[in-house]
């Protein structure tokens, strides 16, 4: 089993070359002895050739350095390949860690843009109706119909497509998105498909009129994606979830199989 040799000694040398580091972050502990004397055990096999954080909650009781300030990549033989000192309160993802290893230049990683639910200033403006009275069939050739037990939809195999729900698809546009957001409204009504959480049934939400601007009601919006002959509707409010069907289950939100997220749009 490989052991990590003197990681903290390496960091000590790094800090000693930059003595004014402590003045930049005045809340960090300056007791180097308690920090560098921290004990560490053998490197576990599942940590070899992977990124490790010097999280001092596991190595030192007095230091306040955290995962967000120092990231180190260590090989199986304990060699430090890269060190990165990051700014405080910076959100780090696995993709950011991959960037540390792949970048030839050392630089501070910029935080990613906010999730859609936090972009409260994003406005989606009405563009035009792009489909009228269309039918949605899933990959099993089931059509979307109303479920009369409540404001829900379900999928069923129909002999007569006149029994299927007819949808109007309305396109919207915003400055922030390159994808095409749409709403799905039951034709000749003001009932709009509204996304919910994963595995929860979509709801039919009644609006007083077709919205000209959508800002807070992003549950009504779906990014329409087309791959080959199949169509997909990804929630703007929940970007990992799609409108989906499943046998003996209401139309709901899902990230993929075993639910069916593939649809075909059938024109009137």
Curated annotation (Swiss-Prot):
Cytokine constitutively present intracellularly in nearly all resting non-hematopoietic cells that plays an important role in inflammation and bridges the innate and adaptive immune systems. After binding to its receptor IL1R1 together with its accessory protein IL1RAP, forms the high affinity interleukin-1 receptor complex. Signaling involves the recruitment of adapter molecules such as MYD88, IRAK1 or IRAK4. In turn, mediates the activation of NF-kappa-B and the three MAPK pathways p38, p42/p44 and JNK pathways. Belongs to the IL-1 family. Monomer. Interacts with TMED10; the interaction mediates the translocation from the cytoplasm into the ERGIC (endoplasmic reticulum-Golgi intermediate compartment) and thereby secretion. Interacts with IL1R1. Interacts with S100A13; this interaction is the first step in the export of IL1A, followed by direct translocation of this complex across the plasma membrane. It is found in: Nucleus; Cytoplasm; Secreted. This is Interleukin-1 alpha. The similarity among the IL-1 precursors suggests that the amino ends of these proteins serve some as yet undefined function. Pfam families: IL1, IL1_propep. The gene is IL1A. Keywords: Acetylation, Cytokine, Cytoplasm, Glycoprotein, Inflammatory response, Mitogen, Nucleus, Phosphoprotein, Pyrogen, Secreted. Acetylated within its nuclear localization sequence, which impacts subcellular localization. Residues 1-112 form a propeptide. CDD domains: beta-trefoil_IL1A (cd23295). The modification Phosphoserine is found at residue 87. InterPro entries: IL-1_alpha, IL-1_CS, IL-1_fam, IL-1_propep, IL1/FGF.
